[in-house]
Amino acid sequence: MDRLSRFYTMKKVIFTLCGIVLMCGTSFAWGTRGHEATTKIAEKHLTPKAKKLLDKYLGGRSIVDFASWADEYKKELLFELDFEPSNAPRRLRFPHTFEANADCSVFDGDRRGDEWVKNCVYMAVGYAKDLKANHKNMNNDERFHKIAMLIHWLGDMHCPAHIRYPGDQTSSGYEVMIGDRAVWYHRLWDGILFNWLHPSSQGDAAEAIDTCTPKEIAKIVEGDLYDWGKDAATASRATRKYRDGAQINRKEFVEEFSELLDQQIRNGGYRLAQLFNEIFQ
C-alpha cells in the first residue's frame, strides 16, 4: 500500500479521533479548519498547469484534503531521521516551526549541524527545489510526501505560534487566562481564535479572507520562502506581548489580532499557490 492509500485508511480513523478531540477541547496546528482555509485559498490561485499536475500527483484529490496530513505524519518523520519519538532530542520534535533572528529574518538552518531540523522554512526550501528539479522522475511516495509537507509547512510558517524568537524559544507554549479559564497560548493561535472569528465552514472562511486584488497578491508573493518567513515573523512578533499567566480579555484580543490572523491565513494561501506555480511551471 503506497503512502497515498495509507493516508485515506488512516484518515477514517483520524476523523473519528478528531470528534473525540474536539469534544475534549484540543486542536491541531493553525486548527485543521485554518489549514484547510489556507489551502482552499491556494487552490483558487493555482495556474491551470500546476493544478493539473497536482490533481495527477494526488490521485485526483484536492490539496485541501491534505491540509493537515503533516500533523499526522510527525512520528514517521522522526523515524526517517533515525530517531524514536520517545528519544528524539526535544528540538527535533518540533519540525513545524522556524527560528527567527533578531531582525526577524529566518535563521539559516544549515549553520549549526542538525539544528536545521526544527526549521520548517529551511526544509521547505529543500523540498521545493527537489520537486522542481525531479518531480517527473520521483516515485509516487516520495513525490506525495514532499507535496503534502509543503502544503502544511506554508500554513505553519505563517502561524504566530510556530515562530521562535531570540530569547523566546517557547512557540507560545505556556498558559494564559481567559476569564477564569487557563488556556495554552499556543492553542489560542492553533485553532481557537480562528474558530471564534470563523465559526462557519472553512470554505466560507476562505471566501471571506481571500479579498486581495491581483496587484496586492503580486506584492505579497514577491521574494522567496526566506522572505516570506521574515515577513511572517515581523508581523507576528506583537503576539508575544502576552506571557505566561497573562490575563486576556477575549473581546480585546479578537479586536487586536483578528486582522493579523486573516492576513496570515491569506498570505499563506497566496504563497502556497505561488510556490506550486513555480515548481510546476
Segments predicted by a language model, with ranges:
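N-terminal, motif-rich segments that launch catalysis or mediate targeting to/interaction with membranes
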Residues: 28-153, 160-281
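Sec-dependent signal peptide recognition
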Residues: 11-16
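Repetitive helical segments and hydrophobic/amphipathic motifs
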Residues: 20-21
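Short, Lys/Arg-enriched N-terminal segments with co-localized hydrophobic residues
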Residues: 1-9
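N-terminal signal peptide c-region/cleavage motif recognized by signal peptidases
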Residues: 24-26
